[in-house]
């Protein structure tokens, strides 16, 4: 979700804040983020803001591979966010095309509730993660973004 339209970002942050607050109200204290640019890092910032008033909250960074962690640590802002995490999990040492799927699978397997920002596309990492969340029978909180892309079979018929 690095390519989000600017006008959607504030709406997404508001919706993420709402879902985080709802999770805290429901008793959740541990949150995970894959630390991708964009939505993942907005989520991190919002959880860490809430940690200031709710010290029991924990954030775990789930990083797909070692060089990604190295590149995050080179930027002051993301290094500070990582340092504020209770734990940093690196899924595998070397990059392989499947690293992001493995990271997402790890987060779903270790979660009771998944919060997903989703544009409705049937392909891609978010769609795959949502399908896996359903298969694992985990609770899913979906935040729609942008123009929702409808699959062809759901589009209105035009004459």
Report each predicted region and the residues it spans.
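Acidic/glycine-enriched connector segments
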Residues: 1-157
């Amino acid at each position: 979700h690095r390519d989000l339209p600017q006008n959607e970002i504030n709406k997404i942050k508001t919706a993420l804040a709402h879902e985080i607050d709802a999770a805290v109200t429901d008793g959740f204290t541990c949150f995970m983020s894959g630390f991708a640019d964009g939505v993942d890092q907005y989520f991190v910032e919002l959880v860490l803001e809430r940690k200031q008033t709710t010290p029991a909250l924990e954030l775990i960074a789930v990083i797909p591979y070692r060089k990604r962690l190295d590149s995050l640590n080179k930027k002051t802002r993301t290094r500070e966010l990582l340092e504020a995490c209770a734990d940093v999990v690196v899924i595998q040492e070397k990059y392989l095309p499947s690293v992001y799927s493995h990271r997402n699978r790890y987060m779903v397997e270790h979660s009771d509730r998944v919060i997903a920002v989703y544009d409705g596309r049937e392909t891609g990492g978010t769609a795959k993660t949502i399908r896996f969340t359903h298969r694992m029978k985990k609770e899913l909180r979906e935040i729609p973004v942008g123009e929702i892309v409808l699959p062809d079979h759901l589009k209105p018929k035009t004459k």
